Amino acid sequence: TATATEINVLDGALKENNSLWIGNDPSSTTDNALNSVAFGKTALDAITTGDYNTAFGYDALTNQTTGNNNVAIGYEALRDNSTTSQNVAIGMSALQESNAAGNVAIGANAMRGTTSTAITGGENVAVGSSALKLNIGGASNTAIGKASMGNNTDGNYNVAVGKGSLNDNTEGSNNTTVGYLSANTGTNDITTGENNTLIGASTAASAAAGTNQTVIGYGSSGQANNSVTLGNADVTAVYMAQDAGATVYAAGMVLGGTSVTSTAAEINIIDGGTSATSTTIVAADRVVLNDNGTMKQVAMSDVATYVGSISSLESLYDAKSGGTNFTESLLIGHETTGTLNAAEYN
């Protein structure tokens, strides 16, 4: 067998303008294409003026004509890209249907797109098998993990980290989900919701269209729009600044189902850091009492009713008023039992 001194003498190979093709010879169109490398049957075989492209694998960048600085490694990677630039596709069918710029897809079927609609959204990052698989117009998304954001079509500026994270989102934007199946538990999976932050495996929003919910902790679920949820239903204590304590600012509180939404003076009843001004007590006012270890609110009208129900001072400790052999008499601060013989009007 003769030794080849030039690559061009090999069947299905071409060296031209600092470019190299092995596996096919597209010499009829490559006169103005510079500094590219292709390895594989039909890899980069339609190029005309595009430069600095790299294609490895059958049908990799096969429709590229004028785009520059693309890297496609794997069967049908960046297959339908034709005129756009600065894409990286590594893995079987990664960015297969794309004709957008600035995307990075690593993993089989990562950002693959659909056969009916070309990918137009750019500047996305998809790492993991089927990550951002069905994306079409969505832009500036980051999906890391198998099937993360797999059903996104037009949502923008989302970040999903973890297997299946934010998988059911289609059009929601500005969401951040971190953790295995975060926002993808099968209950209230985010689809169109926006501005949500879910951190922890199996975290969920309160609704598929939930908005501005912050949910932190394994298995925790958002409760409402514009709310923060810390921990799941098994959490029994929440510490601020570890065990040192911290100042918590809030316009109101709900304690055991009872709302406290008034002034700082009325909220801060423990240390008295803010003093309430004196006021005239009315029947509708309420006081806080300890009922056998449980703090309860009692209306002043109820206090008045109780005090009024006391018919004698015997309810007080070391006190006696009236009674047999003690007519119209009052004794306070002394033994009240024993013999009280005809002690009247004392």
Describe the predicted segments one by one:
Residues T1-G12, A251-K320:
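Fibrous stalk/shaft segments of extracellular and virion attachment machinery
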Residues T5-G252, S309-N346:
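Glycine- and small/polar-enriched repetitive beta-structure motifs of secreted/surface proteins
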